Amino acid sequence: ACTSQQAPKLKEGEKPVDVAAVVRQKMPASVKDREAWAQAIAKTFDSQKLAPTEENVCSVLAVAQQESNYQADPAVPGLNKIAWQEIDRRAEKMHIPVFLVHTALKITSPNGKSYSERLDNVKTEKQLSAIFDDFIGMVPMGQKLFGSLNPVHTGGPMQVSIAFAQQHTDGYPWKMDGTVRQEVFSLRGGLWFGTYHLLNYPANYSVPLYRFADFNAGWYASRNAAFQNAVVKATGVKLALDGDLIRYDSDEPGTTELAVRRLAG
């Protein structure tokens, strides 16, 4: 491997802080369960062996504020319409009459309400994920529309990718009662996996801004974009500074690789 998977350590001259104390100090007093946040983030830093600096703690809080306004299960405006549109889109893609799907959704779900009723009143991604889990697991139509893939891809207070969480469970300090997906929607799980994605990889960035960009675009996207910029200057070839050095949808070389080949002659 080109890099170790060790998290960044304390820089020279940096002083370790009491993570829980910094969380209590920096979070707005209006936030519910500040103590639960403080304990979850402190345990996250300890179990992932992250450098306990004010900058790192504040970086986690900044992402949580940006993504959820410090809510473990944030409400998403218009989520019910989004959910219905996704179901109708899948039905049309599979050439299943929409009215048949809507009829199937009128049956009673495991919580006693119909799937339609739950979808009409859904407010959060956690609720929507649970509806799809039930629908896929209980109703043949659900398997036909979605296979085994729940279409809710992110969750929790930091809106971390569920696929990312499923690939990075080593060292998780709490006992999981359910699935990794369900754990992401908990306060502790959302913070643990979100912090892992934000901080738990070595990157010699000068400012936290680049880690924030990586959080949205993928690990090392900022570094890769800087490399692309250097290639542009060296070759004069225009490239999208998107951080994607290779094509993931094809064996064909991407634009960045083709530009680098020009440098090599």
Where do the PLM segments sit?
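Cell-wall glycan-active module
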Residues: C2-G265
